[in-house]
Amino acid sequence: MKIACLHTAQSNVAIFDEAARALDLPQDALTHKVMPHLLEQAQAAGGVTPEIEKETIAALADLRTDADVVLLTCSTLGGAADFLAQDPGIMRVDRALAQATVTAGQPVVVLCAAPTTLHPTAALFRATLPQTTPLGVELIPDAWALFESGQHDAFHQRVAEAAQQAFARGAGCVALAQASMAGAERYFSHPKLLTCPRAALVQIAARIARERA
């Protein structure tokens, strides 16, 4: 199975490759396309504009022509994938993450780093989880500035600290809303700490297993 990933950060390439190796997916299963200007434009505009959405949809459709599955790995742009929702081969990784929280434990705390991710993430999780599930969607102060300045280790440490604090406050599970946050697992591990790359690739691995059965 060929899996094409559409990223807005180059650093996410290694994160997804690492997650694929951890799940024993074939070494050449993933291909990557990086379009950082999409997120840069969304941040400058204060959100996703129709033009950004249109370009994202076109990029997803183009990748789909040669891939069994296309993953949109940027949570800010996630809504663009919904325009192609009739195609089960196009996935937004944050939706896989939200689906994984349904049975992971309550209350659910979702941590975001980029301000532009906060609104689409909150909408997605509220739509996915049962109405009775306690849900908190939080922005980690100052984290995104670390990422944007290239201080990725400090960024992941800050995310890990926020996750640890959320569990200490009583979270049943903590979801890291952005793929770029997954590196926090190097600094803090917990069986109920969920990440986008793993959640999405677990779904795909399960699909592969069903097809082989």
Language-model segment annotations:
Residues 1-213:
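Non-catalytic structural scaffold of enzyme domains
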